[in-house]
Structure formats: structure tokens, C-alpha cells
Amino acid sequence: QARQHKRKGRESLDCALALQELERLGVNHIITFDAHDPNVSNAIPNLPFENIYPTNTILEDLLQTEDLEDILVISPDMGAMERARYYAELLDSDVGVFYKRRDLSRVVNGKNPIIEHTYMGSDVKDKDILVVDDMIASGSSMLEVGKMLKEQGARKVYFIATFALFTEGIDGFVKAYENYYFDKLYTTNLSYIPKEY
């Protein structure tokens, strides 16, 4: 789930270096789940690289446990748009996306802070929304998106992510859930989630 897959500024390409080191150590096959950027396999062109997506498993569970009506699939940012499109095609639904406008004049915790989220897509009113991404790191963007969708009249909001890291804990998610900013979060056990969560 490494995100050091493309160079920004003077950052290293840690994911590519790690894969090359595994190859030097004699690893002869790489199996991973939902690589942040599957193109990182280009760093090891002579090794088989299997990238397994849990999309269908998550979707099966969602469809068996939820009473979904008018579905709309939404990407929380431009980076997850391909994933959202895939879900939308499987569900024969529309797709929307949030654009993150950032303040490029400053850096906070290694990133340009988000100034605003702008939704681009069809009306969310009375729809069951699936917000899909590969990972939830801190979750602040996902929570902001959920709040905005509910304020715009979404019937239900479901967060779906392969990796739920909760790098800033779950208090924000608990509060957002209590405020009805989202209805349920679907994830996998591919990242460690403490029992108290």
C-alpha cells in the first residue's frame, strides 16, 4: 500500500526501491493487494507482479447487507476516479467526483492544504452514495465529503476503502457517524485495525 510511487520534489521512489531490493534478495514473485499505483510493477519488469483487488468481495458484502435504492458512486478526489468508474459500471449507476482545491502557497505536514472540495456530478438528493477509494489515511477528506453529501440531501452515504489506516485515530469518524455524515464504512482486514476501533 506504499504511496511513494511517483516523485514530487526531492522525494525518493521508496516503493520502487523496496521492490528492487526484494528482487535482489531472491524473491521470485510479488503478490500484493490493491497497489496504490499498479504501474510501480515497472520497477521490477522481470518478476511476476500480481495485484489483487478486493472490490468484488466488498461489493458482494455491501449488496447482501444493505438495502440500496438509487445508487450514485462518488470518487472523493481525482485519483480514485478510475475505481469509482469501475464500481459505477458494475452497478450500472452514475459516477461523480470531488475536486480538491489546494493552497499551493504553503505546505502543512508535507502537503498543500485543501481549501475546498467541489462536487462534480449528478444530483445527490435522495440517493444512496458509495464513496470509494483505495485507502483512508487520516480520513479528513472522506469525512468532509460525507458531510457535504448529507448536506446536499443524500439518503445514505457509505465509505468503501481497501485500507483503513486511521492515522489520526477514529474519534473523527465516531463523531461524524453520530452526526449522520455517513451511514457505514466498508473495509478489509488488510491493514491492522485495533480491537478498540
Please report, for each region that a protein language model flagged, where it lies by residue:
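PRPP-associated nucleotide enzymes
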Residues: 1-197
